[in-house]
Amino acid sequence: MIINKPKKFGKKYSEIQKINFEQSPEIYIVNEEPSKAYFLKLFRKDCNPKKFSYKVKIHRKLNKKENPFFLKYISDSDAELIIREKYIVLEFAQRDSLSNYISGGNFLNEKMAKIVSWIVSKAIMFIHELDIAHGRISIKNIYLDRNYNIKIGGLDSGKMLDNVNKNKIKEYYLKDISALGLLLIQLLTGKDLFDSNFGNANLVKKAISDIKKGNSKKFWEIIKMNSDYNFTLELEELIENMFAEKISDMREILNHSWFSEISALDQKEFEKYKEELKSEFKKMEMNENNGDN
């Protein structure tokens, strides 16, 4: 039997496990020493050096600010003077991404979905205020750490907007907000709108496009045909505004009446809600483990 040796990255990092096989960048769990594990994103060798440096700059820019929302940047191949490889090392989230929890029909109740989407909304507002757009908010880029705190990854797809035209900046922000709408629906239904199991992706795109023209009827018909979740008029309005490109400021999202229950909480009360969310994720893990046995 052939046993492959763990991959080495630069002088510091050894492969523990490769966790994605179908996309670039490749993502590994690595360790620097037995007690320290990290995510390592390995980019193709032919990745344009300027593009790679740009990705690194986004992480370094964010790292200058104390924030609880994103996977912390640790290092990169340029900083370690490694020429033959291009990689970025990030904080390791032990519980993996939300896609492992919200899938196969699993979904969150409305209260829990509000907490997750509130935290993600605060995170998006945080980077928008730093003139950074994320560009790829999705369930696959939202992780849980050891204590079930939400940590967001995927920033290497981001865009720094310091010297970008104001109209263009708005476009980037609208894209993040629209992605938040898709995320919210997936949290509540357990289904990805553009997955083949949900329906025809082109019909969904057309229905979202119709929302921008003021017609949301077809969109909600598709949603209700493929989900048992009962969307309130208040929530429908919020999601429609996200897709209709009527909101470009995250504060409008956070101040929406659908979030009033969360926004009224003080920090101590909010921590209690987070404990409930932690319990919910633990239950999902137990159900998954029982299903495997």
Predicted regions and their residues:
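ATP-binding glycine-rich loop module of kinase domains
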Residues: Q23-Y54
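Short beta-strand micro-motifs within the conserved protein kinase catalytic domain, predominantly
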Residues: K72-K86
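Conserved short submotifs of the Hanks-type protein kinase catalytic core
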Residues: I83-S97
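AlphaC helix of the protein kinase catalytic domain
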Residues: L98-L108
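Activation segment signature within eukaryotic-like protein kinase domains
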Residues: V116-S117
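Catalytic-loop of the protein kinase fold
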Residues: H128-D145
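Terminal C-lobe "cap" of eukaryotic-type protein kinase domains
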Residues: F243-Q267
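Regulatory extensions appended to serine/threonine kinase catalytic cores
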Residues: A264-N293
